[in-house]
Amino acid sequence: MATVKVTLIKSVSGRLPNHKLCVKGLGLRRIGHTVEVQDTPENRGMINKAYYMLKVEG
């Protein structure tokens, strides 16, 4: 399965609760933290919801 690198580039402070949960669900903890997640429809949905706080590669 393909993977995608996701980096948190903006703070989750003051954001919508559902968007905070999406960032947490992706495994991101702090600004600048990068994780590699599988490219599944579930992960893509979380990325699409919180796209304005994330940088996606791959």
UniProtKB/Swiss-Prot annotation:
GO molecular function: structural constituent of ribosome
Gene3D superfamilies reported for this sequence: Ribosomal protein L30, ferredoxin-like fold domain
InterPro entries assigned: Ribo_uL30_ferredoxin-like_sf (IPR036919), Ribosomal_uL30_bac-type (IPR005996), Ribosomal_uL30_ferredoxin-like (IPR016082)
One of the protein's GO biological processes: translation
GO cellular component: cytosolic large ribosomal subunit
Pfam families for this protein: Ribosomal_L30
SUPFAM superfamilies found in the cross-reference section: Ribosomal protein L30p/L7e
Keywords, ordered alphabetically: Ribonucleoprotein, Ribosomal protein
Family: Belongs to the universal ribosomal protein uL30 family.
Description of how the protein assembles with itself and partners: Part of the 50S ribosomal subunit.
Protein name: Large ribosomal subunit protein uL30
Native source organism of the sequence: Pseudomonas putida (strain ATCC 47054 / DSM 6125 / CFBP 8728 / NCIMB 11950 / KT2440)
